[in-house]
């Protein structure tokens, strides 16, 4: 039982660190997709592809490449 308590404590701690990471290093777009602040700072152009969190899945670590213009600004035509 003591080992189980250690495992649960470690999982809760990891979850808190992940939430802290999301708050500090990502921004949320209009469509609810989280964007990496680091990648945005490096490239800065809306023509690049970005590493975005997939919002429709429960897996916190599932990432995909998405088009920055579509995911952050809504569509190509909205200027």
Curated annotation (Swiss-Prot):
State the source organism's domain of life: Bacteria
Please give the name of this protein: Uncharacterized protein HI_0555
Organism placement in taxonomy: Bacteria, Pseudomonadati, Pseudomonadota, Gammaproteobacteria, Pasteurellales
